[in-house]
Curated annotation (Swiss-Prot):
UniProt region (Domain I), positions on chain: 1-63
Domains as described in the record: Has three domains with a flexible linker between the domains II and III and assumes an 'L' shape. Domain III is highly mobile and contacts RuvB.
Residue span of region Flexible linker: 143-147
InterPro entries given in the database record: DNA_helicase_Holl-junc_RuvA_I, Hlx-hairpin-Hlx_DNA-bd_motif, NA-bd_OB-fold, RuvA, RuvA_2-like, RuvA_C, RuvA_C_sf
Described function: The RuvA-RuvB-RuvC complex processes Holliday junction (HJ) DNA during genetic recombination and DNA repair, while the RuvA-RuvB complex plays an important role in the rescue of blocked DNA replication forks via replication fork reversal (RFR). RuvA specifically binds to HJ cruciform DNA, conferring on it an open structure. The RuvB hexamer acts as an ATP-dependent pump, pulling dsDNA into and through the RuvAB complex. HJ branch migration allows RuvC to scan DNA until it finds its consensus sequence, where it cleaves and resolves the cruciform DNA.
Encoding gene, per UniProt annotation: ruvA
Organism, as annotated: Streptococcus pneumoniae (strain ATCC BAA-255 / R6)
Taxonomy of the source species: Bacteria, Bacillati, Bacillota, Bacilli, Lactobacillales
UniProt-recorded Gene Ontology molecular function terms: ATP binding; four-way junction DNA binding; four-way junction helicase activity
An example Gene Ontology CC term for this record: Holliday junction helicase complex
Record bears the keyword Iron: no
Entry protein name: Holliday junction branch migration complex subunit RuvA
An example Gene Ontology biological process: DNA repair
Region Domain III: start-end pairs: 148-197
Keywords assigned by UniProt, alphabetized: Cytoplasm, DNA damage, DNA recombination, DNA repair, DNA-binding
Amino acid sequence: MYAYLKGIITKITAKYIVLETNGIGYILHVANPYAYSGQVNQEAQIYVHQVVREDAHLLYGFRSEDEKKLFLSLISVSGIGPVSALAIIAADDNAGLVQAIETKNITYLTKFPKIGKKTAQQMVLDLEGKVVVAGDGLPAKVAVQASAENQELEEAMEAMLALGYKATELKKIKKFFEGTTDTAENYIKSALKMLVK
């Protein structure tokens, strides 16, 4: 089993990228290959998961360890295979995905590619309470608590995500507050003031 591969991205197609490591080109199936277009002919570290089938050995690649954990959670659901899991991750709506699972919003879940009503219900059954989004809006973390260093700030950012604020906005706000100490409530009040300006 591989944790990650480090090498040069040599090719990007609609379904995969090629990562060359020690003279070997690995085909890595990724959620959004074009997200790597700025890294062609540059070194990259891609987290991987290997799937072995009778007819093929496939490698799936991820931008972060958290994205890989989300993928593994998704493929643990009956009815979701690796291709469907990548399609869900490619939608780049991890906060919406988690919220829909927690609120049992089947209609929302069926908007993801290749997810029907039965599969959406199975997702809720299997993943409810097990998948949370990191407070900075980066790819979802699976069953991970807020970091101990500033749990109040993490809780505030999660609450703001739940209110519908964009992860990109919150990432900037979180950086502004890093190194400070306050309550989650005060962080939210300050963040709202910053967003209204």
